[in-house]
Every structure is written in structure tokens, then in C-alpha cells.
């Protein structure tokens, strides 16, 4: 515990907007009932009064354009049980004021592969957006065959809940037609088939190629080798004029990842300690049950005490599950989300790099044209000035009997055409780089806002879980004391 006491969290700043106008609270849809209340804690705010509760709701509606899109993932259910095609489906409940929805409240069941399809389509159609990532499918539960266990499905439900919540908070992605169809369509399989056909016709790689979570900067597909070659070459090329804005964003993102990884280790240790205490409490209750046979005269008191200890252990298990499955998972999901933003920053840097390289190529072509126009590439001493390449080319042309003046004019004409083409390409690359940079700046603002809302929800859920646990513990032991007083047991002062 000494290690935990020495942990320093002073380098983390959590921003919360204070809103003094609490009377200007905006109506918002809340989940009054749910088949799995535990999942709802990680969902939208429950409207508890607080210093910034009304302000957060007001900001949320302003940032999202005034339309409500509230999604809850719950009730993991194993379908086709007992067959080789078994899978887990999740209940998605949506409350919305979007006019494109047929009903204000819809419920559908979706499996994980449906989420994967939605994610890939969003990555393909919104390449300038930081599409929130899905929970990693490559986990040991698939190797051990425990992917249908309650612990695994609960963790995944929490992560899918956060995935939809981030989409619902994003000012652009929340308006995507594919998202609305995912949340409402009764024939989702037909939607996937039609989208798959259109995606395969639109790009050579189809939907499956866009798996970078919004970091793919260019449309079309040049093949895996071209992508690898570009990445390899760009690894040794640096931007000549880096934008200070994005350098600071990258530094803040790295610092966020470092802090989240540190907190994750601490929370994981806390969850393990809670599991140890739960096990100890169960052992204690079991040992007191054994005392009944040895001391039958105190059977009532011992049995009530053991039952109270078991209730405390059950409450602690519930708290541990929330800490481990929901809050700890939210830290890991936020690290993955931050990685998506970094990929988007890399894509912006790549566009700037493309623009700078095209500019250099254009300047070099203009220099070559000017040298040809001044006749410096030919003559007795000019061949040495043009370098070994020009010298060798001149000698080869002499051997072949080529007219140097005609060759110079041909090369000059080709350079003029190349310069004209490069000028257009440079202008296109400049406009694309600037527009993409502006979009990335807006994405960073959206990421910061979504992060702030998500942290508030997760902290509220964690606080609620602790309040519920300690309130239940207090009630359990107060009830035990009352029962003992009725039995006439004299309690120590």
C-alpha cells in the first residue's frame, strides 16, 4: 500500500465547466429502467444535481447541434447455443430526437461483427475523422474458449457502450446514415450486403481496407506494397516546417497516454485487492458457520453475523466488478481512442510531407529548366557543372550522333509540361493539406470534449458504485445490530 500512497497524480488536470445558470437545464432523455442496471452507470448522466451537471447537459446539446442521440448497450445473450455458429448478441436501446428515426425509442440486437462492419464503413467514409476504435478482438478469451463467459461479455458490453457513446457525441459521425441504420434497421443484414457491394465498387480494396480508424488519408488503393513503401520512405523524411499546434497536441496526447497507463496500473492493483478482501470475507463467513456446531448456544448471533459478512462480500464483489470491468476498461479504451487521434495526426503530417516534397520537386524542375534555357548543360566546361550525370549523358549523345540543341529543346519542352503539371499538383496538395489540417484541429476539439464528457460519466459511475456499496454495508450492519438488540445480546460499547 506504500506504493499507492506515493503515487503522484498532480500532473493530471481534469477540466470541468462551471455553470452558474443551473436553472437553464435542458431536458434530456434518461433511462428509467434497464434489464441490466450495471451497464447504465457507464451511460449518460442521471441528472443528479451538482455544480456542473446542468452545464454539462447544456454544453452537450450545444456541441451536438441540439439533437439527442442516447444509446445504451446491455443484456449480452448467447445465440444459437449448443451449435458451432454460437455468438453473443447485445441489446441496443436508443433514445433520440433525430427526425430521421421512425420512432423516438428503438431497441435492436447486434453482434460484435455488426459493430466491426459499422466501424469499417465509418473509417472508409469519414477518413478525416478520428473514428473511435472497437475493443480488441484478439484476446486470450478466444484462445481459451471463454468468450461466452459473463465476465468477458460484460467487459465487451461496457466497451461497446463507450464506442456508441463516442459516436453519439461526435458532431459529424452522429449524423451518419449508416449509424442510424445500425441503431434502428430491422433488416441490418440487407444493409450490410448493399453497403458491401457499393464499397467493393467504390474502391479496389473494399471496406476491409479501411481499418486504420480514420488515419487513412488518401482514398483508393495502391496495394499493400505501395503503402509499406510509402511508410518506409517517410520514416526517414521529416517535415521541414512543422506546425506548432500539432506538436503540442502530440505532446499532450503522449502525456495523456502516460498518465492513463499509470492510473490503469493503480486501478488494476486496487481491483485485485478488492478481490482478495472479498475472498477473505467469504472465508471468514464460512469459518463462522462452522462455529455453530461447536457453540450451539450462540447459533442465532453467529448465523446472523456470517450472513452479514457474506452480504458485505457480495457487495464488494459488485464494486470490484464495476471497477474492473467498467472503469478499468474505460482507461484502456481511452488509450486506444488516443491512439486513433495520433494516427490522424500522422495522416495530417503525411499530407504536409507530400505537399513539401511536391514543392521541392517543382523547384528542382524549375531549376533544371532555367539551366537548360541558359545553355549551362552543354559546352566544354558546363558538363562538369551539371554533374557526372550530365557529362555521361552528353558523351552518350555524342556517340549516338544526337543534336545537342534539339535534345535540349526537347528536354526543355518536357520540363515545361512537367512544371505545369506539378504546379497544379502542388496547389491541390496545398489546399488538401490545409483543409485536412483544419479538419484535424476540429477533430482534436471534438476529442477533448468527448474525453471530458466520458471522464465525467466514468467518475460519476465509479462514485455511485462506491456510494451504493458503503450505503449497503451500513444498512447490513445496522440491521445486524438491530437483530442482536432484539435477541437481547449485549453489544460492546
UniProtKB/Swiss-Prot annotation:
Q: What SMART domains is this protein classified in? A: PX
Q: Which InterPro entries match?
A: AH/BAR_dom_sf (IPR027267), BAR_dom (IPR004148), PX_dom (IPR001683), PX_dom_sf (IPR036871)
Give the compositionally biased regions (Basic and acidic residues). 56-65
Provide the family line: Belongs to the sorting nexin family.
Q: Which residues form a coiled coil?
A: 248-292, 338-363, 405-442
* Keyword field: Autophagy, Coiled coil, Cytoplasm, Endosome, Lipid-binding, Membrane, Protein transport, Transport
Compartment(s) where it occurs, according to its Swiss-Prot or TrEMBL record: Cytoplasm; Membrane; Endosome membrane
Name the Gene Ontology molecular function terms of this record. Answer: phosphatidylinositol binding
Positions with a binding annotation for a 1,2-diacyl-sn-glycero-3-phospho-(1D-myo-inositol-3-phosphate): 111, 113, 137, 156
Identify the species of origin.
Neurospora crassa (strain ATCC 24698 / 74-OR23-1A / CBS 708.71 / DSM 1257 / FGSC 987)
Main site of residence?
cytoplasm
Task: Give the UniProt record's GO annotations in the biological process aspect.
Answer: endocytic recycling; mitophagy; piecemeal microautophagy of the nucleus; protein transport; reticulophagy
Membrane topology qualifier: Peripheral membrane protein
- The gene it comes from is vsp-5
Q: Give the protein's biological function.
A: Sorting nexin, involved in the separation or division of vacuoles throughout the entire life cycle of the cells. Involved in retrieval of late-Golgi SNAREs from post-Golgi endosomes to the trans-Golgi network, for cytoplasm to vacuole transport (Cvt), and autophagy of large cargos including mitophagy, pexophagy and glycophagy.
Q: Where is this region: Disordered?
A: 1-77
| Annotated protein name in UniProt | Sorting nexin-4
GO cellular component terms, alphabetically, are: early endosome; endosome membrane; phagophore assembly site
| Gene3D superfamilies assigned | Arfaptin homology (AH) domain/BAR domain, Phox-like domain
Please give the superkingdom of this protein's source: Eukaryota
Amino acid at each position: 500500500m506504500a506504493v499507492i500512497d506515493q503515487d503522484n497524480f498532480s500532473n493530471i488536470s481534469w477540466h470541468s465547466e462551471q455553470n452558474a445558470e443551473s436553472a437553464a437545464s435542458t431536458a434530456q432523455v434518461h433511462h428509467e429502467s434497464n434489464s441490466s442496471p450495471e451497464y447504465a452507470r457507464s451511460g449518460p448522466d442521471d441528472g443528479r444535481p451538482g455544480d456542473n451537471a446542468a452545464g454539462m447537459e447544456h454544453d452537450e446539446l450545444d456541441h451536438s447541434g441540439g439533437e439527442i442521440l442516447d444509446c445504451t448497450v446491455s443484456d449480452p445473450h448467447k445465440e444459437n447455443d449448443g451449435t458451432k455458429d454460437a455468438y453473443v448478441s447485445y441489446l441496443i436501446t436508443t433514445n433520440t430526437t433525430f427526425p430521421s428515426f421512425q420512432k423516438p425509442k428503438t431497441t435492436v440486437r447486434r453482434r460484435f461483427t455488426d459493430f466491426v462492419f459499422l466501424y469499417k464503413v465509418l473509417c472508409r467514409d469519414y477518413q478525416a475523422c478520428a473514428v473511435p476504435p472497437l475493443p480488441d478482438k484478439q484476446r486470450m478469451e478466444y484462445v481459451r474458449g471463454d468468450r461466452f463467459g459473463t465476465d468477458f461479455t460484460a467487459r465487451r458490453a461496457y466497451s461497446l457502450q463507450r464506442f456508441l457513446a463516442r459516436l453519439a457525441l461526435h458532431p459529424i459521425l452522429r449524423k451518419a446514415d449508416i449509424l442510424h441504420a445500425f441503431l434502428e434497421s430491422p433488416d441490418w443484414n440487407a444493409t450490410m450486403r448493399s453497403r458491401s457491394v457499393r464499397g467493393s465498387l467504390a474502391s479496389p480494396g473494399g471496406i476491409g481496407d479501411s481499418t486504420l480508424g480514420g488515419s487513412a488519408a488518401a482514398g483508393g488503393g495502391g496495394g499493400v506494397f505501395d503503402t509499406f513503401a510509402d511508410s518506409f520512405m517517410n520514416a526517414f523524411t521529416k517535415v521541414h516546417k512543422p506546425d506548432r499546434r500539432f506538436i503540442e497536441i502530440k505532446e499532450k496526447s503522449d502525456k495523456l497516454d502516460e498518465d492513463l497507463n499509470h492510473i490503469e496500473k493503480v486501478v488494476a492493483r486496487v481491483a485485485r485487492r478488492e478481490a482478495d478482501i472479498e475472498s477473505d470475507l467469504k472465508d471468514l463467513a464460512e469459518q463462522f458457520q462452522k462455529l455453530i456446531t461447536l457453540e450451539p448456544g450462540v447459533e442465532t448471533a453467529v448465523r446472523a453475523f456470517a450472513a452479514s459478512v457474506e452480504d458485505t462480500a457480495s457487495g464488494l464483489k459488485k464494486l470490484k466488478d464495476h471497477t474492473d470491468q467498467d472503469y478499468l476498461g474505460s482507461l484502456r479504451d481511452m488509450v486506444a481512442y488516443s491512439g486513433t487521434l495520433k494516427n490522424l495526426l500522422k495522416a495530417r503530417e503525411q499530407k504536409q510531407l507530400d505537399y513539401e516534397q511536391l514543392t521541392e520537386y517543382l523547384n528542382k524542375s524549375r531549376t533544371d529548366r532555367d539551366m537548360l534555357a541558359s545553355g549551362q548543360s552543354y559546352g566544354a566546361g558546363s558538363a562538369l557543372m551539371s554533374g557526372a550525370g550530365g557529362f555521361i549523358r552528353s558523351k552518350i549523345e555524342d556517340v549516338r550522333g544526337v543534336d545537342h540543341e534539339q535534345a535540349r529543346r526537347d528536354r526543355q519542352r518536357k520540363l515545361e509540361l512537367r512544371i505545369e503539371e506539378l504546379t497544379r499538383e502542388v496547389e491541390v496538395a496545398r489546399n488538401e493539406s490545409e483543409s485536412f489540417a483544419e479538419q484535424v484541429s476540429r477533430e482534436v476539439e471534438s476529442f477533448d470534449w468527448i474525453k471530458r464528457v466520458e471522464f465525467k460519466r466514468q467518475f460519476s459511475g465509479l462514485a455511485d458504485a462506491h456510494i451504493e456499496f458503503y450505503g449497503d454495508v451500513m444498512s447490513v450492519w445496522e440491521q445486524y445490530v438491530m437483530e442482536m438488540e432484539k435477541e437481547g445480546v449485549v453489544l460492546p460499547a
